[in-house]
Amino acid sequence: MCIAYEAVAWGAYVSTWQDSLRIIKKVDRANFGMCWDAFHVLARIWGSCALPSGKIEGGDEALRRSLEELVDVLRGEDGEKIFYVQLSDGEFYDPPLGEGHKFWVQGMDERLIWSRNTRPFPLESEFGGYFPIGEVIKLILTEGRFQGWVSFEIFDWRMRDEKFLPEQAAERGWKSWVELNII
């Protein structure tokens, strides 16, 4: 059995994939590795549901540096510690998250609210997705030479509707997968 440890964007102590890797190295067990979650990485250093632009100032540069570091890790001896990559998009909020927004919860970290409600399948711009997921996964698979599992983790408020069918999620997921494979 393998255990995949994952940093979350709103984490108080472990909020980046680099934090996860440090802990994984301290645990030092062959079956203890990382789930590298694109949403948490992007929501921490690149995007924001609470800003009108949807982007953190300096986010492009922070993401570039983070991905360069990830590629170095994937190509090095620690690459085997990344067990799988998890993908979703992030929905652009217009208006931005704040008091009065339908997802607003007083006292809750904005990234947690975002994560729980508006993570469509990758590349679903028709559902507000705007993260650079295509560029991210291309870099991980080509330059990083990642050959492990890739999964989708979706939290989309539209799927809570009782009229929403599992078949619809499967269709959306398949469409996303096909589009990612074209990139």
Question: Where do the model's predicted regions map?
Answer:
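Tryptophan-centric aromatic hotspots in well-structured domains and transmembrane helices
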Residues: 40, 147-149
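Short acidic/histidine-rich active-site segments
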Residues: 151-154
